[in-house]
């Protein structure tokens, strides 16, 4: 086995300058996005997720109301509806992720 040759010293790291990374250009984001702006943008990108969340919350609220009133059959139906709405929301999230991944590849 051959002994490694002498290592040529590289330029020392200068902490005052960021390292150069190929394909990366640092930019300064001057306008940070607030909660309201981000919520509106995300809702426009994938409107089915908030719809699913509202459906889930509505089914849960009405199911608890029926449970409180003693309507156990209707309460059970609303809990099953809530599970379906949660499933719809998860599928909407996954489809939104898949669409954004395909958009970034193109």
From Swiss-Prot:
Give the transmembrane ranges.
47-67, 83-103
Main localization (coarse) = mitochondrion
The keyword Repeat is assigned to this record: no
**N-acetylalanine modification, residue list:** 2
In terms of superkingdom, the source organism counts as Eukaryota
- Subunit notes for this chain? Associates with cytochrome c oxidase (COX, complex IV); proposed complex component.
Q: Which PANTHER family match?
A: HIG1 DOMAIN FAMILY MEMBER 2A, HYPOXIA-INDUCBILE GENE 1 HIG1 -RELATED
Function per UniProt: Proposed subunit of cytochrome c oxidase (COX, complex IV), which is the terminal component of the mitochondrial respiratory chain that catalyzes the reduction of oxygen to water. May be involved in cytochrome c oxidase activity. May play a role in the assembly of respiratory supercomplexes.
Q: What name does UniProt use for this protein?
A: HIG1 domain family member 2A
Protein source organism: Mus musculus (Mouse)
The gene is Higd2a
